[in-house]
Amino acid sequence: MDRLDSLVTRRAAVGAIGTVLASSGVVYGASRLDTESDESTGLPFHGSSESTGFGIDLDGHPIMGAPDAALDMYYWGDYQCPFCRRFEQNTLPEIIEKHVRTGTVRIVFIEYPYLSDASMTAAVMDRCVWRQVRDERPSRYWPWHSAVFDAQGEKNSGWASRPNLLEITRGVQDVDATAVDACMRKRGYGIEQEIGTDVEQASSFGIRGSPGFVLYDPTTQEAGKLVGAQPHDRFDAAISKLRNE
């Protein structure tokens, strides 16, 4: 997959979607200020109804890390994407240890289902799981997210069917598969429209596949983009560059 390290100003990047954001509009406080850490990982998750200075609407997206982290990392992924699974297994743990736990980076998880209808099914379920846990047990999103990637099979082989994903969900503690199923039935179409908007916005940033990443510094209003299952040292370099280290 293509790799891009270009460093661009926030205004130039957001201008690509025809939007000019005043610097005073940069918002990083979570609307739900209480963060919860998973007992096994110690990773804080939170939600927000705000938009960032880069133009990302945080509503509906799980956020891992401190609300006041120095940098945002927007991560577009597809549960069927083998490169995303490689990133999750080989690179993400290093990013979490070196940059999330230390308060430097917070990660915003954004769905980019592009491989098939099954990818959209998984993306909608992701939104429904987050909707269920975000207010009282936001950290429970992480075991579900990890379980789905652990169960990944060949793309479009049927492993990401709704019944199979619900079976995976039943195996995750404190995630109610019945409520998730009801959410998909009641809200599925609307959620698909929201995800479609996210995909269009990602495309305007030059994201054409998954995984795709934008690192954004709200202080300098600069951003760096990475595409593909890059090794952790590529992220280390991008983070250092944005922080002028």
Language-model features and meaning:
Residues S23-V26, Y141, R162, A177, ...:
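Alpha-helix initiation and N-capping motif
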Residues W76-D78, I110-P113, S146-F149, R185, ...:
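Active-site-proximal beta-strand/loop segments in catalytic clefts of secreted hydrolases
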Residues P62-M64, E154, L226:
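Short clusters of hydrophobic/aromatic residues that line enzyme substrate/ligand-binding pockets
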Residues Y79, R85-R170, R208:
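Structural alpha/beta surface segment adjacent to cysteine/selenocysteine redox centers
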Residues D2-S116, Q193-E194, A238-E245:
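Extracytoplasmic thiol/disulfide redox context detector
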Residues D2-G18, Y28-A30, G171-E245:
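C-terminal cap of thioredoxin/glutaredoxin-like
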